[in-house]
Amino acid sequence: MSRIYNFCAGPAMLPAAVMQKAQQELLDWNGLGVSVMEISHRSKEFIALAEQAEVNLRQLMNIPNHYHVLFMHGGGRSQFSNVVNNFLGDHGRALYLVSGQWSQSAVEEAQKLAGEAQIDALNIVTKADGLNQVTLPDLHSIKKDYRYVHYCTNETVDGIEIFDELDSPWPIVADLSSTIMSREIDVSRYGLIYAGAQKNIGPSGLSIVIVRDDMLKLASLPQSSVMDYRIAAENGSMFNTPPTFAWYLAAEVFNWLKGLGGVEVIAQVNQQKAQLLYACIDDNSFYRNGVAKQNRSQMNVTFQLADDSLDSRFLAEAERAGLVALKGHRIVGGMRASLYNAMPLEGVQALVTFMSEFATKHS
């Protein structure tokens, strides 16, 4: 069977080496004669796996000791609710920066739970020369008392990524679902980081929360115990049965990334992949991208064909060439190539070759 390159935005492709290892030990993990899916999450074997996974994640992201690492149920949307329920209380206020579809969804969930009076939303995307660009606001000039400011580092639907560090007088809560471990960040700048697993960490059903100790101590009491970050921290993320197979695969992805040389190394590969694809788009009038260069996403490259009547043919021929899941999100249309950590450089090279040949054939 010829190689298939999966450009899905999420659930996304996993590293081939991780999938092969999971396949090999699916029925007999760690010499136990049973699958890792079948053992107790409180067994000494699984607890050892969980503890090592946290150690590896801390090393990969250089997470300071005064931060808690939580492995929680659900994806990024579940944390939209959890953040509000843990930190706003009855009278707290929060500021949400809106840069695209996902940050807007976070606003809507927060306003649904806390009410519009407690949630301020600030759009930070403008157009210049027909291109979307992000302008980070001067938050120190805003004379309000917020519990936190929330933003999303990468908008997977819109193809917009924020590379500049946010400077804030209030704790920063960041949705890193699609950029976590794709490039180096300074974790100490954040009060809380959350990320759904299904892009750069593992399969869906798991989310990672990295929360600073002082924020955890100031948290209000959510109505639901399974949403309570403090309870999760006090119980090693095992207050209730966790998604053990997703946790296991995340642990294997951490091992894989460490074996490559860590985030510093994969960041260079990711930059190379994105530059290669954007160069193909920019060098050919057959394709176009609508994002200013300084905010073009490295993880989710969105583009349109000059003649959108060819969209269906492009997708069909790409699939026959082993390049799948390139259809853009239904809200924006066009095409989208997701280049998460597991996407090899060879996959992007194959896509660029196909795009060049398709443009030549249909120009």
Swiss-Prot record:
Keyword Transferase: yes
One cellular-component annotation, GO: cytoplasm
Subcellular location as annotated: Cytoplasm
GO molecular function: O-phospho-L-serine:2-oxoglutarate aminotransferase activity; pyridoxal phosphate binding
Reaction(s) catalysed by this chain's protein: O-phospho-L-serine + 2-oxoglutarate = 3-phosphooxypyruvate + L-glutamate; 4-(phosphooxy)-L-threonine + 2-oxoglutarate = (R)-3-hydroxy-2-oxo-4-phosphooxybutanoate + L-glutamate
Pathway where this protein functions: Amino-acid biosynthesis; L-serine biosynthesis; L-serine from 3-phospho-D-glycerate: step 2/3; Cofactor biosynthesis; pyridoxine 5'-phosphate biosynthesis; pyridoxine 5'-phosphate from D-erythrose 4-phosphate: step 3/5
The keyword Amino-acid biosynthesis is annotated on this UniProt entry: yes
Family designation: Belongs to the class-V pyridoxal-phosphate-dependent aminotransferase family. SerC subfamily.
NCBIfam families tied to this protein: PRK05355.1, serC_1
Name this protein carries in UniProt: Phosphoserine aminotransferase
